[in-house]
């Protein structure tokens, strides 16, 4: 599965779940899980403002994650690095005499209507 499709599926599930929690009512202080403490947020999250937890900000973060560049598309079209004449460019002197005659006669072909 492509990472973009996975991110969109995650976003869709997140938004659907968000809608269900809004209908059922928000969690109150008496509905906290047994394993959670009721104290303030840990200091590691103190610098994060509360607006980051909105659905719009979650959507924005997912879109930014999808748009991060992984590799340049030019990476796929690199010249051959190993093999014959890998360190230099082609020249007509490197070709044998028969190939030189062939390339001198080569002309662009016309396809389609004449």
Swiss-Prot record:
Coiled coil: none annotated. GO terms for biological process: acute inflammatory response to antigenic stimulus; excitatory postsynaptic potential; maternal process involved in female pregnancy; negative regulation of appetite; negative regulation of heart rate; negative regulation of insulin secretion; neuropeptide signaling pathway; positive regulation of blood pressure. PANTHER family: NEUROPEPTIDE FF, PRO-FMRFAMIDE-RELATED NEUROPEPTIDE FF. Keywords: Amidation, Cleavage on pair of basic residues, Neuropeptide, Secreted, Signal. Residues 22-69, 85-100 form a propeptide. The keyword Ligase does not apply. Belongs to the FARP (FMRFamide related peptide) family. One of its GO terms (molecular function) is G protein-coupled receptor binding. Its main location: secreted. It holds the Pfam family NPFF. The gene is Npff. It comes from the Eukaryota. It is found in: Secreted. InterPro entries: NPFF. Morphine modulating peptides. Have wide-ranging physiologic effects, including the modulation of morphine-induced analgesia, elevation of arterial blood pressure, and increased somatostatin secretion from the pancreas. Neuropeptide FF potentiates and sensitizes ASIC1 and ASIC3 channels. The modification Phenylalanine amide is found at residues 82, 111. It comes from Mus musculus. This is Pro-FMRFamide-related neuropeptide FF. Residues 1-21 form the signal peptide. GO terms for cellular component: axon terminus; dendrite; extracellular space; neuronal dense core vesicle; perikaryon; postsynapse.
